[in-house]
Protein backbone atom coordinates (compact mmCIF):
# COMPACT_ATOMS: atom_id res chain seq x y z
CA UNK A 1 0.00 0.00 0.00
CA UNK A 2 2.96 2.35 -0.49
CA UNK A 3 2.62 4.61 -3.53
CA UNK A 4 4.11 7.93 -4.58
CA UNK A 5 1.12 8.85 -6.70
CA UNK A 6 -2.04 9.65 -4.77
CA UNK A 7 -5.71 9.92 -5.46
CA UNK A 8 -7.25 13.09 -4.07
CA UNK A 9 -7.17 12.69 -0.30
CA UNK A 10 -10.42 13.42 1.50
CA UNK A 11 -9.88 14.73 4.98
CA UNK A 12 -10.96 16.63 8.03
CA UNK A 13 -9.16 18.36 10.83
CA UNK A 14 -9.09 17.57 14.48
CA UNK A 15 -11.10 14.36 14.54
CA UNK A 16 -12.98 13.27 11.52
CA UNK A 17 -16.17 11.28 11.02
CA UNK A 18 -17.31 13.38 8.07
CA UNK A 19 -14.14 12.61 6.14
CA UNK A 20 -15.84 9.52 4.79
CA UNK A 21 -18.09 11.67 2.63
CA UNK A 22 -15.15 11.96 0.24
CA UNK A 23 -15.48 8.36 -0.90
CA UNK A 24 -17.87 9.65 -3.56
CA UNK A 25 -14.79 10.54 -5.63
CA UNK A 26 -14.54 6.88 -6.66
CA UNK A 27 -15.73 5.91 -10.13
CA UNK A 28 -16.64 2.32 -9.29
CA UNK A 29 -20.07 1.33 -10.56
CA UNK A 30 -23.02 0.26 -8.48
CA UNK A 31 -22.68 -3.24 -7.09
CA UNK A 32 -18.89 -3.27 -7.20
CA UNK A 33 -16.59 -3.47 -4.19
CA UNK A 34 -14.33 -0.61 -3.20
CA UNK A 35 -11.63 -0.14 -0.59
CA UNK A 36 -10.69 3.06 1.18
CA UNK A 37 -7.82 3.72 3.57
CA UNK A 38 -8.35 5.99 6.57
CA UNK A 39 -5.04 7.18 8.02
CA UNK A 40 -5.93 8.30 11.52
CA UNK A 41 -4.30 9.08 14.82
CA UNK A 42 -3.81 6.92 17.88
CA UNK A 43 -6.97 6.83 20.04
CA UNK A 44 -9.59 6.55 17.27
CA UNK A 45 -9.43 2.79 16.74
CA UNK A 46 -12.59 1.95 18.66
CA UNK A 47 -14.48 4.90 17.23
CA UNK A 48 -13.91 3.86 13.64
CA UNK A 49 -14.44 0.18 14.33
CA UNK A 50 -18.00 1.14 15.26
CA UNK A 51 -18.45 3.94 12.76
CA UNK A 52 -17.19 1.95 9.78
CA UNK A 53 -20.05 -0.54 10.18
CA UNK A 54 -22.58 2.29 10.11
CA UNK A 55 -20.89 3.87 7.11
CA UNK A 56 -20.77 0.57 5.21
CA UNK A 57 -24.53 0.15 5.63
CA UNK A 58 -25.14 3.76 4.58
CA UNK A 59 -22.92 3.50 1.51
CA UNK A 60 -24.44 0.19 0.42
CA UNK A 61 -27.93 1.67 0.63
CA UNK A 62 -26.87 4.84 -1.19
CA UNK A 63 -24.77 3.36 -4.01
CA UNK A 64 -25.18 -0.41 -4.02
CA UNK A 65 -21.44 -0.75 -3.43
CA UNK A 66 -19.75 -2.77 -0.71
CA UNK A 67 -16.99 -0.72 0.88
CA UNK A 68 -14.10 -2.04 2.94
CA UNK A 69 -12.49 0.55 5.21
CA UNK A 70 -8.85 -0.13 6.05
CA UNK A 71 -7.51 1.65 9.13
CA UNK A 72 -4.02 2.94 9.90
CA UNK A 73 -3.30 4.40 13.35
CA UNK A 74 -0.35 6.11 15.03
CA UNK A 75 0.78 9.42 16.41
CA UNK A 76 -0.85 12.21 14.40
CA UNK A 77 2.38 13.92 13.38
CA UNK A 78 3.97 10.60 12.51
CA UNK A 79 0.94 9.62 10.41
CA UNK A 80 1.08 12.90 8.49
CA UNK A 81 4.75 12.28 7.74
CA UNK A 82 3.98 8.72 6.61
CA UNK A 83 1.42 10.05 4.11
CA UNK A 84 3.85 12.68 2.84
CA UNK A 85 6.49 9.97 2.42
CA UNK A 86 4.26 7.64 0.45
CA UNK A 87 1.66 5.90 2.60
CA UNK A 88 -1.50 5.65 0.50
CA UNK A 89 -4.49 7.44 2.04
CA UNK A 90 -8.01 8.10 0.79
CA UNK A 91 -9.04 9.75 4.05
CA UNK A 92 -6.96 11.35 6.78
CA UNK A 93 -8.47 12.03 10.21
CA UNK A 94 -5.79 13.58 12.36
CA UNK A 95 -5.49 15.38 15.68
CA UNK A 96 -4.31 18.78 14.46
CA UNK A 97 -4.97 20.99 11.46
CA UNK A 98 -1.20 21.55 11.52
CA UNK A 99 -0.68 17.92 10.49
CA UNK A 100 -3.19 18.15 7.66
CA UNK A 101 -1.69 21.46 6.55
CA UNK A 102 1.65 19.65 6.24
CA UNK A 103 0.05 17.20 3.81
CA UNK A 104 -1.49 20.11 1.91
CA UNK A 105 1.88 21.88 1.77
CA UNK A 106 3.36 18.73 0.26
CA UNK A 107 0.96 19.18 -2.66
CA UNK A 108 -1.33 16.24 -1.87
CA UNK A 109 -4.44 18.20 -0.89
CA UNK A 110 -6.03 21.19 -2.56
CA UNK A 111 -6.20 24.36 -0.48
CA UNK A 112 -9.43 25.21 1.32
CA UNK A 113 -9.94 21.83 3.01
CA UNK A 114 -11.23 23.46 6.20
CA UNK A 115 -14.13 24.98 4.30
CA UNK A 116 -15.20 21.67 2.78
CA UNK A 117 -17.21 20.60 5.85
CA UNK A 118 -18.92 22.35 8.78
CA UNK A 119 -17.04 23.49 11.90
CA UNK A 120 -13.76 23.87 10.00
CA UNK A 121 -13.96 20.17 9.12
CA UNK A 122 -13.69 19.22 12.81
CA UNK A 123 -16.96 17.41 13.60
CA UNK A 124 -16.13 16.19 17.09
CA UNK A 125 -13.88 17.19 19.96
CA UNK A 126 -12.39 16.01 23.23
CA UNK A 127 -10.48 17.64 26.07
CA UNK A 128 -7.42 16.88 28.19
CA UNK A 129 -7.71 15.11 31.57
CA UNK A 130 -5.58 13.18 34.04
CA UNK A 131 -5.95 9.42 34.44
CA UNK A 132 -4.79 8.27 37.89
CA UNK A 133 -4.85 4.98 39.74
CA UNK A 134 -7.94 4.15 41.79
CA UNK A 135 -8.14 6.14 45.00
CA UNK A 136 -5.71 8.71 43.58
CA UNK A 137 -2.90 7.64 45.95
CA UNK A 138 -0.71 10.65 45.07
CA UNK A 139 -3.66 13.08 45.51
CA UNK A 140 -3.14 14.60 42.07
CA UNK A 141 -5.71 17.34 41.49
CA UNK A 142 -4.22 19.91 39.12
CA UNK A 143 -1.29 20.73 36.87
CA UNK A 144 0.92 21.99 39.67
CA UNK A 145 0.88 18.50 41.19
CA UNK A 146 2.64 17.19 38.09
CA UNK A 147 5.85 19.05 38.94
CA UNK A 148 6.15 17.51 42.42
CA UNK A 149 9.25 15.41 42.98
CA UNK A 150 7.17 12.39 44.03
CA UNK A 151 5.01 12.30 40.88
CA UNK A 152 5.93 10.37 37.72
CA UNK A 153 4.11 11.49 34.58
CA UNK A 154 3.21 9.65 31.37
CA UNK A 155 2.51 11.67 28.22
CA UNK A 156 3.38 11.03 24.57
CA UNK A 157 6.01 12.84 22.54
CA UNK A 158 4.92 16.21 21.08
CA UNK A 159 7.23 15.60 18.11
CA UNK A 160 5.10 12.69 16.90
CA UNK A 161 1.74 12.85 18.70
CA UNK A 162 -1.09 15.32 18.18
CA UNK A 163 -2.53 14.49 21.58
CA UNK A 164 0.84 15.25 23.15
CA UNK A 165 0.76 18.71 21.62
CA UNK A 166 -2.66 19.36 23.11
CA UNK A 167 -1.29 18.11 26.46
CA UNK A 168 1.59 20.55 26.14
CA UNK A 169 -0.73 23.44 25.24
CA UNK A 170 -3.05 22.65 28.17
CA UNK A 171 -0.10 22.72 30.57
CA UNK A 172 1.15 25.94 28.98
CA UNK A 173 -2.27 27.58 29.35
CA UNK A 174 -2.32 26.67 33.04
CA UNK A 175 1.17 28.10 33.54
CA UNK A 176 0.21 31.22 31.62
CA UNK A 177 -2.71 31.78 33.97
CA UNK A 178 -0.97 31.18 37.29
CA UNK A 179 2.26 32.99 36.35
CA UNK A 180 0.52 35.98 34.71
CA UNK A 181 2.26 35.54 31.36
CA UNK A 182 5.73 35.49 32.90
CA UNK A 183 7.40 33.41 30.18
CA UNK A 184 10.48 32.61 32.23
CA UNK A 185 8.35 31.05 34.96
CA UNK A 186 6.10 29.39 32.41
CA UNK A 187 9.05 27.77 30.66
CA UNK A 188 10.47 26.62 34.00
CA UNK A 189 7.11 25.01 34.82
CA UNK A 190 6.98 23.14 31.52
CA UNK A 191 10.60 22.07 31.87
CA UNK A 192 9.98 20.65 35.33
CA UNK A 193 6.83 18.84 34.15
CA UNK A 194 8.70 17.11 31.34
CA UNK A 195 11.57 16.25 33.66
CA UNK A 196 8.99 14.18 35.55
CA UNK A 197 7.95 12.25 32.42
CA UNK A 198 9.16 8.64 32.57
CA UNK A 199 8.82 7.87 28.87
CA UNK A 200 7.76 9.85 25.80
CA UNK A 201 5.81 7.32 23.73
CA UNK A 202 5.22 8.04 20.05
CA UNK A 203 1.42 8.25 20.36
CA UNK A 204 -1.49 8.59 22.75
CA UNK A 205 -2.41 4.90 22.67
CA UNK A 206 1.13 3.73 23.37
CA UNK A 207 1.28 6.18 26.29
CA UNK A 208 -1.95 4.68 27.61
CA UNK A 209 -0.40 1.22 27.29
CA UNK A 210 2.62 2.35 29.31
CA UNK A 211 0.38 3.62 32.10
CA UNK A 212 -2.46 1.09 32.07
CA UNK A 213 -0.86 -2.18 31.01
CA UNK A 214 2.76 -1.66 32.03
CA UNK A 215 1.99 0.07 35.32
CA UNK A 216 4.34 2.97 34.68
CA UNK A 217 3.79 6.40 36.21
CA UNK A 218 1.40 7.96 38.69
CA UNK A 219 -0.63 9.98 36.18
CA UNK A 220 -1.36 9.86 32.48
CA UNK A 221 -2.13 13.09 30.63
CA UNK A 222 -4.68 11.98 28.05
CA UNK A 223 -7.56 12.73 25.75
CA UNK A 224 -10.76 12.47 27.78
CA UNK A 225 -12.15 9.83 25.42
CA UNK A 226 -8.99 7.75 25.87
CA UNK A 227 -9.24 8.06 29.66
CA UNK A 228 -12.92 7.06 29.57
CA UNK A 229 -12.00 3.92 27.65
CA UNK A 230 -9.46 2.93 30.31
CA UNK A 231 -11.97 3.48 33.12
CA UNK A 232 -14.62 1.54 31.20
CA UNK A 233 -12.27 -1.42 30.76
CA UNK A 234 -10.91 -1.34 34.35
CA UNK A 235 -13.28 0.65 36.60
CA UNK A 236 -11.66 -0.72 39.75
CA UNK A 237 -8.17 0.33 38.66
CA UNK A 238 -8.43 3.90 37.39
CA UNK A 239 -10.26 7.20 37.79
CA UNK A 240 -10.32 10.51 35.96
CA UNK A 241 -9.29 13.90 37.31
CA UNK A 242 -10.38 17.04 35.43
CA UNK A 243 -7.69 19.71 35.96
CA UNK A 244 -8.32 23.44 35.76
Which residues fall in each region the model found?
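Short, low-complexity disordered leader/linker segments with a strong preference
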Residues: 1-35, 57
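Early extracytoplasmic/lumenal segment of secretory-pathway proteins
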Residues: 24-106, 116-117, 223
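Stable alpha-helical elements in mature extracytoplasmic
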Residues: 43-47, 51, 79, 88, ...
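General small-molecule cofactor/ligand-binding pocket signal
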Residues: 70-72, 154, 200, 241
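Alpha-to-beta junction loops
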Residues: 86-93, 150-152, 213-222
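A conserved helix-loop-strand patch within extracytoplasmic ligand-binding domains
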Residues: 104-177
Amino acid sequence: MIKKKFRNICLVSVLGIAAFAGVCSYDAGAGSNIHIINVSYDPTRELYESYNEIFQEHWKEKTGQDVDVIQSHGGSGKQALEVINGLQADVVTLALDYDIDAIENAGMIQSGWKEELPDDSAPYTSTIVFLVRKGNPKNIQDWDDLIRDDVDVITPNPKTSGGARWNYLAAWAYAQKIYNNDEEKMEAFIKKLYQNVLVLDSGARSATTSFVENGQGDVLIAWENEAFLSVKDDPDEFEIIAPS
